């Protein structure tokens, strides 16, 4: 206990140097903490939103764009596909369930999604207030939508054409307002930031604005489209043959969410590697700074350390003072770094929420964070080894020699 207390006092005998070392090491650890949290929370968010969706079928174009627009709702869709073509897939022996998704409108930047009740069942989300829609032009809104927009059960609103995050600039469908009949409980899934309604609602909104007469209305009904379909397989073996079937025999494309998200994460990983390298440079710089500080401390305290040796302190205890001092630095920097990393993650989550993007943020302590104190320990001990060895070699005779001189 005395060694620990002495090391603490030695550390703060030079407060500016100690504070700078803690800050420098803490910044490196904060960067590592932030990267680990981003990776963990993004992976969890994608897992929640992609769970149980084996393939997405939509208009031809970019497969990644199809996944980002239809599952994560982060991009514009590749186009629409005929309703008849999607219905034809329902009879395919490898298809267990199809969930149609129709996009095109939004409210204050939040997307209005035409679908069926299976969409809610798929994610297992429960109603917090109100009831499910039972007819067109009724909507159930996500928890984040309700919180940010102020909409309540019974409120009416008109959608805006387009999926822009600003929610402005598009045509407002004032002739066909929606009525809020339910609010979903917060689930942490993509449903938190969506307004869900029957597919017929989306058709009705656009047919009302487009049809000039009854004949036009009939033609539009015969040519109805959806944006895409979320599909579950009857067997995992379908992943080999079903996408090829869709891509080669229809005018649509099939994209596997797991494959496209892996590609996305690998692309994002390039930027992550740069940040990780930057954090590594910070840690190396911090280690060098700690080494210089401890080495200087040994030089400055050499007479005092020699006095301790003359008073009977063993060499191991003298060296331990330097090692414990380094451990104090590691402990303080770890606390600072992990708190700063959590704060940065919360700030990122808040910013993404404002952009109606992926739901991340909040306090999380994944097992990967154990790497942070381990890194701090390695850097501190590596920096303290040579100074500790120098302290170990201090002899009581040095004090006598300096006194005789």
What do the PLM-derived regions correspond to, one by one?
Residues 36-111, 118, 135, 242-246, ...:
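Hydrophobic, regular-secondary-structure patches
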């Amino acid at each position: 206990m005395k060694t620990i207390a002495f090391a603490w006092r030695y550390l703060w005998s030079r407060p500016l140097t100690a504070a700078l070392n803690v800050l420098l090491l803490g910044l490196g650890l904060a960067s590592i903490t932030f990267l680990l949290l981003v990776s963990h929370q993004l992976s969890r968010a994608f897992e929640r939103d992609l769970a149980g969706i084996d393939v997405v079928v939509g208009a031809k174009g970019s497969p990644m764009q199809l996944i980002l627009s239809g599952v994560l709702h982060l991009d514009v869709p590749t186009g629409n596909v005929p309703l008849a073509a999607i219905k034809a897939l329902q009879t395919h022996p490898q298809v267990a369930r199809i969930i149609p998704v129709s996009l095109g409108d939004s409210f204050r930047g939040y997307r209005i999604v035409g679908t069926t009740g299976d969409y809610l069942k798929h994610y297992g989300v429960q109603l917090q207030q109100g009831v499910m829609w039972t007819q067109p032009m009724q909507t159930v809104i996500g928890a984040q939508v309700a919180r940010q927009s102020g909409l309540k059960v019974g409120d009416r609103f008109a959608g805006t054409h387009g999926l822009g995050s600003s929610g402005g600039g598009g045509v407002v469908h004032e002739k066909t307002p929606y009525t809020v009949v339910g609010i979903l409980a917060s689930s942490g899934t993509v449903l938190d930031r969506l307004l869900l309604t029957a597919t017929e609602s989306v058709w009705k909104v656009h047919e009302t604005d487009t049809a000039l007469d009854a004949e036009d209305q009939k033609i539009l009904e015969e040519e109805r489209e959806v944006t895409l379909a979320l599909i579950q397989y009857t067997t995992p073996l379908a992943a080999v043959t079903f996408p090829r079937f869709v891509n080669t025999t229809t005018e649509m494309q099939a994209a596997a969410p797991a494959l496209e998200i892996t590609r996305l994460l690998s692309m994002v990983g390039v930027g992550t590697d740069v940040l990780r390298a930057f954090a590594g440079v910070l840690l190396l710089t911090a280690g060098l700074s700690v080494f210089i500080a401890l080495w200087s401390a040994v030089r400055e305290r050499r007479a005092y350390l020699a006095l301790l040796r003359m008073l009977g302190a063993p060499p191991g205890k003298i060296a331990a003072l330097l090692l414990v001092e380094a451990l104090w630095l590691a402990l303080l920097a770890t606390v600072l770094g992990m708190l700063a990393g959590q704060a940065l993650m919360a700030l990122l989550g808040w910013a993404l929420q404002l952009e109606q993007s992926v739901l991340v943020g909040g306090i999380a302590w994944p097992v990967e964070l154990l790497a942070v104190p381990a890194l701090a320990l390695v850097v501190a001990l590596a920096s303290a080894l040579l100074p500790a060895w120098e302290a170990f070699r201090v002899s009581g005779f040095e004090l006598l020699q300096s006194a005789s001189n």
